[in-house]
Every structure is written in C-alpha cells, then in structure tokens.
Amino acid sequence: MALLDFFLSRKKSTANIAKERLQIIVAERRRGDTEPAYLPDMKRDLLGVICKYVQIDPDMLSVQFEQKGDDISVLELNVTLPENEESPK
C-alpha cells in the first residue's frame, strides 16, 4: 500500500509551502537571534564616551546582545584598555 500511496499522493500547494517557510522565519525571529536596531548607535556612543577618558581603537570595543528566554536580555561590553595610560588631547 505504501507504494500506491506514493504514486497517488498529491504535491503540496505553493500556498502551504509558503506558509511553512513563513512560520520558520517567524519562529527564528521570535527566538531573538537578531540584535536590536539601536545596538550600532549604542556602540558608537559608548566608544565616544570611553575615548573622552582613554584613547582606544574602535576594534578594542566589543558590544554583544544576547536574549535568554522571553524576559532576560544580556548586554555584554568588553573594552581592551591600552597598557600606557595616555589621556586624550
């Protein structure tokens, strides 16, 4: 019977395929893998504030956003400070 079912089965309609793909996209976005839109601006502002006190290269600042669960968000900020303590001019 499985062979008969194979040959008589209908193909999924394009609407059903599109619906399944859309559900996958929505589920991925709800999972929180994307970073907030304000994160690049926040990184630029943080770099400006840090540079007021210590001269650093933009590559020495790392800002990462992580969503844990539905109600917990973690913003991780790593700054590599130079060994010599030159203040900006």
UniProtKB/Swiss-Prot annotation:
Gene Ontology biological process terms, A to Z: cell division; regulation of division septum assembly
Alphabetized HAMAP family for the sequence: MinE
Name of this protein: Cell division topological specificity factor
Function as written in the Swiss-Prot or TrEMBL entry: Prevents the cell division inhibition by proteins MinC and MinD at internal division sites while permitting inhibition at polar sites. This ensures cell division at the proper site by restricting the formation of a division septum at the midpoint of the long axis of the cell.
Residue stretches in coiled coil: none
Keywords, alphabetical: Cell cycle, Cell division
Family of this protein: Belongs to the MinE family.
